[in-house]
């Protein structure tokens, strides 16, 4: 059986692009790779890409010169986790406090990992997790 090499893209659907982009760039430090009115692609590390789509702007098929991207959209808050180093946990906690981003929760996992939970401007639940969360992380 062929093997999956990793998760490449994760999509979030946002009400307004500017505050969403500012949050992920200014607060979390992700680097923009592409930015249009309907889409922002951010470098999420280790070949990972976070795609921010303006709500309703990607629900129709998008024909292009090299093929058609099927339409997609989502609604409601979703959850995503970013991997962080254990030694950066307190630095991230301080950075969120400095930016006045309230923590929803902190969790100490049985395998030794720790997580910080907070929300982005669209109410999506964001997690920063250290190693020790899953058998493979």
Task: Give the positions of each predicted feature.
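N-terminal beta-strand motif that seeds the catalytic metal site of vicinal oxygen chelate
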Residues: 1-18, 79-80, 132-137
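Vicinal oxygen chelate
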Residues: 3, 93-137
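Short glycine-enriched loop/turn motifs at secondary-structure junctions
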Residues: 4-6, 73-77, 109-110
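Short hydrophobic/aromatic beta-strand micro-patches
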Residues: 13, 81-85, 119
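Amphipathic alpha-helical segments
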Residues: 16-31
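Short amphipathic alpha-helices within nucleic acid-binding modules
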Residues: 23, 88-95
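Short secondary-structure junctions
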Residues: 29-34, 103-106
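Conserved short beta-strand elements that form part of the metal-binding/catalytic scaffold
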Residues: 33-74, 125-132
